[in-house]
Amino acid sequence: MRTLAFFQTLVMTGLLVAASAASVVATRSVAAIKADILALAQSFAGQGDPDFSRQEALEKLVAELLAAAPQPPVAARLDLLAGPWYQVWGPYDYRGGDRGTVDPKITVDEIYQVVFRDGYYYNVNPVRGKSRIALLRGEFQPVPGYPDMLKVRFTRFPGNKGRPEDIPLWELAALAEAGELPAGTTIVPGFIVRWFFGGGFLREVYTDADMRITYAGDRVDDRADEHIYIMTRARSGA
């Protein structure tokens, strides 16, 4: 009897320890995980990632976030997705070469993506060394059978000569769409963009009111080719 009681005590102790450990894990809030993701992304700002080590460090936290806050399909998140986003960290080379490098023409601390609910977005960024704002337009649509994926096709690449002093950069996107840029120009003709820029896929893994985490890749099923973006909601004065 004493032996049985001893083993019962061991089992109960083990269960209590496991429950206690689970409680500790459960107390880590979504806000705390997001804060860690943001702090780590900010520490990587302006840096390339040729060996994917920075992305892998972020992905551990992203996995924890998704376990704590599972996401509905991206089609149900389009209202949240809409609006201007600031790139805290992600790829800094969009020329089709090694995405682990940093394109010297990119102003790494002023990269924005402005998403419109109607199925298009603009990448907005000042061109380093030139008095010009680049606005690359892409159209997107959900991918059947892939609930978090958007297929992207680039369509136009306008720009604005000079930097407006009275509006945030991301507001140029709506003006570009309306053909009302204050000093509009064409960086690359539309037919060249449509023929040669192609497109790709965005895997929207997390969206809320102030944070967005997405992956960009060339193929729908190639996770090894994906590159992560950590974004926060762009706001005036922020």
Set out the residue ranges of the language-model regions.
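N-terminal chloroplast transit peptides
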Residues: 1-6, 14-27
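Compositionally biased, low-structure terminal segments
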Residues: 7-8, 53
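Soluble ligand-binding/transfer domains with enclosed cavities or grooves
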Residues: 25-238
